[in-house]
Amino acid sequence: PVPLTRERQSSRGYNQSEVLAKGLEMEMKVPVYPAVLERLKSKSSQTKMGREERLKNIIQSFRLANREAIRDRHILLVDDVMTTGATLDACCQCLLGGNPASIRLATLAMAVNY
């Protein structure tokens, strides 16, 4: 799952992406590794930002905390909502450093502008 900052998860009491991932874990019978990625910075909320602002805001916000857990494995990265893809892109860039066999993305919702 896409991690939250410790402060955000503490104030919220849960990580919505991890809740979704745990549901997939039960249905798909595959393990969830919530400690593979770590969110480093407490950034501004991205809900009101455009794509360029989101891309700048999210740079260097994640680190790969457990390379061995993903080496040569097929990864399904779970997030609740994809708006511009900036967060998922930043996470994928980190995950690639662990040499996974593949990375796929799953979101509950995707924001689309018409």
Regions found by a protein language model. Give the residues of each.
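Conserved PRPP/pyrophosphate-binding segment of the phosphoribosyltransferase/PRPP-pathway fold
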Residues: 1-76, 86-114
